[in-house]
């Protein structure tokens, strides 16, 4: 089955403990992303920063066989289970081929 590409835009909470939750879940989240990269599901991504350079969210480009598969990944990601990402937008996406 052909994979579909998606962009995930996720915003962290804005409470005083938000950055601590992110940092506590970060290594597990990155390990998950490394596995996805090896499996071909992770395209690119990184942190959204505020004007002071503090991480306040993430943008992730991924490819899955279905939206359901993407939702399964999201539900298990440490940034979701660790209550880091508070608002998540998912949109279909297509990488330009240069």
What are these regions (language model features)?
Residues 1-98:
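Conserved, structured core segments of small domains
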């Amino acid at each position: 089955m052909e994979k579909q590409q998606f962009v995930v835009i996720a915003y962290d909470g804005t409470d005083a403990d938000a950055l601590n939750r992110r940092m506590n879940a970060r290594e597990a989240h990155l390990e998950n992303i490394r596995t996805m990269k090896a499996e071909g599901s992770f395209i690119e991504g990184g942190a959204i920063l505020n004007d002071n350079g503090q991480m306040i969210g993430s943008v992730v480009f991924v490819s899955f066989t279905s939206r359901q598969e993407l939702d399964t990944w999201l539900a298990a990601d440490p940034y979701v289970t660790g209550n880091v990402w508070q608002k998540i937008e998912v949109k279909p996406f297509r990488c330009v081929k240069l």
